[in-house]
Swiss-Prot record:
EC numbers on record: 1.3.1.98
Gene, per the UniProt record: murB1
Span of domain FAD-binding PCMH-type: 29-196
Biological role: Cell wall formation.
Main location: cytoplasm
InterPro entries per record: FAD-bd_PCMH, FAD-bd_PCMH-like_sf, FAD-bd_PCMH_sub1, FAD-bd_PCMH_sub2, MurB, MurB_C, MurB_C_sf, Oxid_FAD_bind_N
Cofactor dependency: FAD
Originating organism: Bacillus cereus (strain ATCC 14579 / DSM 31 / CCUG 7414 / JCM 2152 / NBRC 15305 / NCIMB 9373 / NCTC 2599 / NRRL B-3711)
GO terms for MF: FAD binding; flavin adenine dinucleotide binding; UDP-N-acetylmuramate dehydrogenase activity
NCBIfam families documented for this protein: murB, PRK13905.1
Family matches, as PANTHER family: UDP-N-ACETYLENOLPYRUVOYLGLUCOSAMINE REDUCTASE (PTHR21071:SF5)
Any single biological process term in GO: cell wall organization
Protein's recorded name: UDP-N-acetylenolpyruvoylglucosamine reductase 1
Length: 301
């Protein structure tokens, strides 16, 4: 491992951190250390990292802004690549937007709304990165990434880089082909937006933000929605009908504001959260015969 670290540093791939606590990089403020954390400063840094990872036969994982993650208390084995400031370029040409995967989604939707471009209003309260949003087809307010994405540039596991169209990404509810058949890293995204009235777009975004503030617990560290909605039900409604609102294990608590959120009230461990997730699954199955599936990604040792 030490030799790999030295080669990564010599290759100037970006910041290279050893045994770095991942709680610093997730919105839940939970997570053990990464053996090696890379914050690449350019695409070439990612390519070189993957070359070395293959050479050393080391496991690797990619994270974005950590908004939809629950990282194990034992951390993540191997190399963790965090997409961020090195991949945050932005080009706007009329209605076409080309943006790096590390660009914050809220910042992007806010900026474009002020330019009178419509289509990303739903993302005004999603605290993730563009890359993560494409990877999981993030959405809210009856819309999602698939409704506005034209194509995405992907770095595949074998080192190949290619564009995948909206159709090729095979989007579905909170899912894409990148999670299953064609694993890879989102490097860039191209969105096709529409011209709109600036005042109306900004008002719509503000309404979305206000709704989220009133109904969701953003005053505590959390990872967003824990479960996918088991259509035709809403996950939060089922949790609340089961009488689990406010239930606590250790430092983790099912939010008093919204049943589909688990918050870190202070000092919560990943195991606390996992115990709550299992409690919810079993309770909902027993009471309503509904299977619950997590939307939050659970990773680590």
């Amino acid at each position: 491992m030490e030799q790999l670290v030295n080669e990564l540093i010599e290759a100037d791939v970006g910041r290279v951190l050893v045994n770095e606590p991942l709680a610093r990089y997730t919105t839940m403020k939970i997570g053990g250390p990464a053996d090696i954390l890379i914050v690449p400063k350019h695409v070439a840094g990612i390519e070189k990292t993957l070359q070395l990872v293959k050479q050393y036969k080391t496991k690797w994982t990619v994270i974005g802004r950590g908004s939809n993650l629950l990282v194990s208390d034992q951390g993540i084995e191997g190399v963790v690549i965090r997409l961020g400031e090195g991949l945050d370029h932005l080009e706007v040409e009329k209605h076409k937007v080309r943006v790096g995967s590390g660009y914050p989604l809220i910042k992007l939707s806010t900026l474009l709304s002020r330019q009178g471009l419509a289509g990303l209003e739903f993302a005004s309260g999603i605290p993730g990165s563009v890359g993560g949003a494409v990877y999981m087809n993030a959405g809210a307010h009856k819309s999602d990434i698939s409704s506005v994405l034209s194509k995405a540039l992907i770095l595949f596991e074998d080192g190949a880089i290619d564009w995948l169209t909206n159709k090729e990404l095979e989007f579905s509810y909170r899912a894409s082909v990148l999670q299953t058949k064609r694993p890879g890293i989102v490097l860039e995204a191209v969105f096709q937006l529409q011209a709109g009235k600036r005042e109306e777009i900004v008002r719509s975004m503000q309404n979305n933000k206000d709704y989220r503030r009133e109904t969701q617990p953003w005053n505590h560290p959390c990872a967003g929605s824990v479960f996918r909605n088991p259509i035709p039900h809403f996950a939060g409604d089922l949790v609340e009908k089961a009488g689990l609102r406010g239930y606590r294990i250790g430092g983790a608590q099912i939010s008093e504001m919204h049943g589909n959120f688990i918050v870190n009230t202070g000092g919560a461990s990943a195991q606390d959260v996992l115990s709550l997730i299992e409690l919810i699954k079993h309770t909902i199955k027993d009471k309503f015969d509904v299977d619950m599936h997590t939307e939050v990604e659970i990773i680590g040792r």
